Amino acid sequence: MKTAIVYYSEHHGNTKKLLDAIAAQHEVTLINVTKQPETDLSAYDRIGFASGIYYSSFAKQLIAYAQEYLPEGKEVFFIYTHGAPKGTFLNAIRRVTEAKNCKEIGEYHCQGFDTFGPFKLLGGIAKGHPTAEETADAVAFYAKM
């Protein structure tokens, strides 16, 4: 299946580390929404959305991209890294994919080093994440889909 993963990974590049590991072992197109993003996704069978978590949600830029360019009825999946414990991080992106009648086929998440907002005052949280094991788990998640 032809697959693209649209992503936003800033600050420490935690999410991009997972995607690079996936792309090293599988044929997948990585689309960075901050750099010349591809806008025609119709040729892809599956579309992943990957992001760090910002204020308990996927990046606004990624959500806006999905609203504008995600075709109707595609298979979608989510990959994300977060500093804080798991929460309702997928609500906003799921609203977009559900409105476009997409079929969700999976999600993978793990902690990522986070110095955003108040965590900076503490020297960050989740240092050393994603780990090699978490990265391997992301690759295994992708392979199983």
Tell me the role of every PLM-derived stretch.
Residues 3-4, 10, 16, 23-31, ...:
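FMN-binding flavodoxin-like domain, especially the glycine-rich phosphate-binding loop
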Residues 34:
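Catalytic beta/alpha-barrel core
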Residues 37-43:
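Short amphipathic alpha-helix with an adjacent loop that forms part of the alpha/beta core around
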